Amino acid sequence: MVSEKIKAGVIGVGHLGQHHAKHYHLRNDVTLAGVYDTDSNRAKEIARQYNTKFFDTPQDLMEICDGISIVTPTESHYSIAKIAIEDFNCHVFIEKPITETTVQADDLIKSAKAKNKLIQVGHIERLNPALTVLEQYNLNPKFIEIQRLAPYTVRGTDVPVVLDLMIHDIDILLSLVKSDVKSIHASGVSIITDSVDIANARIRFKDGTVSSITSSRVAKDKVRKIKLFQENLYATIDLLLEQTEIYTITEDPSLIPDVLKTEPFTQNNESKHIAYQKPNLKKYDMLGLEIKNFIASIRGKEKPIVNGIEARNALDVVIKINNMI
């Protein structure tokens, strides 16, 4: 249990890493001990902005920290996290994906366990209020359709769309379905880049659940939607607009809270209703909540929202999909 302020550092202060630095800086239970970036001018700029130090090496920063955010290209995640955990006894928050390979992920998980350190992974969509509202429902989905489409941008195109975009939805899928994967079928094509730009995966689980996931980075408009079907319930989740709509089949709609409208129908000579809900969702800064969770986990008050094992399992499925295309 840590009682004084947590000393946190950020390795990689580019587009996303700068926001890690900001959130540590804003917390009154954290000292932003410093930042490091391969671009020293960028590190100096962010350090100046958040009244902290910049360091010439990651190791110099790790030496004074309790926890480290690793917000660097994926190929460096393993080496940086390994040093932070084993040589400097740091807890680590790694932006997704956890590592390049499952072998690397397994080794990090083993090291963290031996050193009694946390691995938290930044699968930020898990905190989307349109998704977390489903925790109020008894979910047992049988079919899940997920779409994540985005207009083309240069950022992120150095890796296939499966590793860049689809990994978000694989992590969500594995959190919704409490069963092991039975089979995967996948296809994809290159449109603009030399790697896969559009991909579709059909995943079947051992409990019979089926999912179809499509990811594209050459779409006209942004789309991030989930459709979830189970016995007597259908939900549509818009992660982009942060809206959720739920349709429930019930004999007594008065038992369902906050119903906006109902539609009666007859099934097998029984009177039933389709009850429609559109929960009023509270919006919040999801990265800020991830950082809050990381600090609370270091203190032993919470558990990481996405731990190393969960992130490793998502990576495993993503790699299998990518290898199949």
What are these regions (language model features)?
Residues 20, 50-111:
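Beta-loop-alpha module in the N-terminal Rossmann-like domain of NAD(P)-dependent dehydrogenases
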Residues 170-247, 280-281, 286-300:
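Contiguous beta-strand/loop segments that form the cofactor/metal-binding neighborhood of enzyme cores
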Residues 99-156:
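A contiguous active-site-proximal alpha/beta segment in oxidoreductase catalytic domains
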Residues 1-2, 67-70, 289-325:
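C-terminal helix-rich "cap/oligomerization" subdomain common to oxidoreductases
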Residues 122-129, 152-181, 196-197, 311:
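Mid-domain beta-loop-alpha active-site segment that forms a flexible
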Residues 56, 93-94, 119-121, 237:
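Hydrophobic residues in well-ordered beta-strands that form the structural core
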Residues 33, 66, 142:
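Conserved acidic residues
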Residues 1-50, 173:
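N-terminal Rossmann-like dinucleotide-binding module
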